Amino acid sequence: MDRAVSTTTNAVEWAKAPGLTDYPSALAEMQARAAAIRAGEEAERVWLVEHPPLYTAGTSARDADLLHPGDAQVFRSGRGGQWTYHGPGQRVAYVMLDLSRPHGRVPARDVRGFVAGLEAWLIDTLAGFGVRGELREGRVGIWVANPLGGESKIAAIGVRVSRWVSYHGIALNVAPDLGRFGGIVPCGISEHGVTSLAALGVAATLDAVDAALARSFERVFDAAPQPV
């Protein structure tokens, strides 16, 4: 069925996939939507998904950092970055935007600015749950300080931009099985841990996180999420 493209420049489709989405289907859907956005045939979209247990390798991933995947599937993703884990209890948001034009805080044709926008989006979302997300020099993603010292990663960012249309996106740990991250060296960083909202004592549902993501997206990208 044909979907009309919104003529409102500050509106972005906001879609949520039911159940668990297999990775090859997600990748094919992202690539198709990115091509349609580039051709002016479809609207920009943020797509919220939850995956079955799997590991994805970015373009900088080293084979040695895949330690013991167990029964989880393994994929080469084509996005930037290194290894990460996706699975139940983690909210993945795939972000397909036309970066040839500005989006709120993100200038036109500025990939670094786009990544900074994704960082700000996650930090603002976490603040709504009383969690202080922080950036670290030389380390992509969002970090939180541990009560007993040190720090852990709570959200990952990995994107690809092709002819100024983005795809892939962010992964926020709500209540996943953190033990699964032991199957890899997450993002090539072995000296720091991984955490989640649940591990921090925040009892948030995926629906509550989705609502917070929508509010924060509008603030950062100046684009009203339009449910589809």
Swiss-Prot record:
Residues 40-225 form the BPL/LPL catalytic domain. InterPro entries: aa-tRNA-synth_II/BPL/LPL, BPL_LPL_catalytic, Octanoyltransferase, Octanoyltransferase_CS. It is found in: Cytoplasm. It is an enzyme of class 2 (transferase). The keyword Nucleotide-binding does not apply. It catalyses: octanoyl-[ACP] + L-lysyl-[protein] = N(6)-octanoyl-L-lysyl-[protein] + holo-[ACP] + H(+). Keywords: Acyltransferase, Cytoplasm, Transferase. Its EC number is 2.3.1.181. Pathway: Protein modification; protein lipoylation via endogenous pathway; protein N(6)-(lipoyl)lysine from octanoyl-[acyl-carrier-protein]: step 1/2. GO terms for molecular function: lipoyl(octanoyl) transferase activity. Substrate binds at residues 79-86, 156-158, 169-171. It holds the Pfam family LplA-B_cat. Its main location: cytoplasm. This is Octanoyltransferase. It comes from Acidiphilium cryptum (strain JF-5). The gene is lipB.
